Amino acid sequence: MIGRLRGILLEKQPPEVLIEVNGIGYEVQMPMSCFYELPNIGEEAIIYTHFVVREDAQLLYGFNTVKERALFREVIKANGVGPKLGLGILSGMTASQFVSCVEREDVSTLVKLPGVGKKTAERLVVEMKDRLKGWGAGDLFTPFTDAAPTDSAAASSNSAEEEAVSALLALGYKPTQASKVVSQIAKPDMSSEQLIREALKSMV
């Protein structure tokens, strides 16, 4: 079981990062709410991981705090919710926002998340409301900021849009939906991370 990685960020391709630890590169998929808070490429990062073994793959899901990882593990315990859907859920909103939605039984907001229909949203509320009692939000979770991306190197407008669409597809959004929302919000000076952030905000 791989539970924590501390190393140098080599690549950031939303929603995946490549982090080098003692000469070994680990590919880690992260919710966008955590991805935004990562340091620059070439800098040290600490990622708390959840390890998934399938017949065809071994996957790592990463988080900035132990609490965020714990919430992810609670989410994927819900009937019909796997790691990919859990990643999409915690990309569409922050951990604290999700906890708040469950506590308030806000099904109408949950159904806006990728892959979450009404039945799944209702199931999340029913199955998780008691389990999340007392969690609270505050400083336990990574804040969802509007700060500019940390990487100094900005991609061109077209490649940023393509990268944003690819990230949304990886999170479970449909191709037509992803392309439409990115084209609507895209501006020449926006990075892929800014595009993804604004796209996710507009769809929730």
Swiss-Prot record:
Region (Domain III): 156-204
SUPFAM superfamilies: DNA helicase RuvA subunit, C-terminal domain, Nucleic acid-binding proteins, RuvA domain 2-like
Keywords for the protein's UniProt record, in alphabetical order: Cytoplasm, DNA damage, DNA recombination, DNA repair, DNA-binding
Function recorded in the entry: The RuvA-RuvB-RuvC complex processes Holliday junction (HJ) DNA during genetic recombination and DNA repair, while the RuvA-RuvB complex plays an important role in the rescue of blocked DNA replication forks via replication fork reversal (RFR). RuvA specifically binds to HJ cruciform DNA, conferring on it an open structure. The RuvB hexamer acts as an ATP-dependent pump, pulling dsDNA into and through the RuvAB complex. HJ branch migration allows RuvC to scan DNA until it finds its consensus sequence, where it cleaves and resolves the cruciform DNA.
Molecular function GO terms recorded: ATP binding; four-way junction DNA binding; four-way junction helicase activity
Region (Domain I): 1-64
HAMAP family: DNA_HJ_migration_RuvA
Region (Domain II) location: 65-143
Keyword Nucleotide-binding among record annotations: no
Quaternary structure and partners: Homotetramer. Forms an RuvA(8)-RuvB(12)-Holliday junction (HJ) complex. HJ DNA is sandwiched between 2 RuvA tetramers; dsDNA enters through RuvA and exits via RuvB. An RuvB hexamer assembles on each DNA strand where it exits the tetramer. Each RuvB hexamer is contacted by two RuvA subunits (via domain III) on 2 adjacent RuvB subunits; this complex drives branch migration. In the full resolvosome a probable DNA-RuvA(4)-RuvB(12)-RuvC(2) complex forms which resolves the HJ.
Region (Flexible linker): 144-155
Organism the protein comes from: Vibrio parahaemolyticus serotype O3:K6 (strain RIMD 2210633)
SMART domains reported for this sequence: HhH1
Comment text on domains: Has three domains with a flexible linker between the domains II and III and assumes an 'L' shape. Domain III is highly mobile and contacts RuvB.
Cell compartments where the protein resides: Cytoplasm
Annotated protein name in UniProt: Holliday junction branch migration complex subunit RuvA
Record GO cellular component, one term: cytoplasm
Protein family: Belongs to the RuvA family.
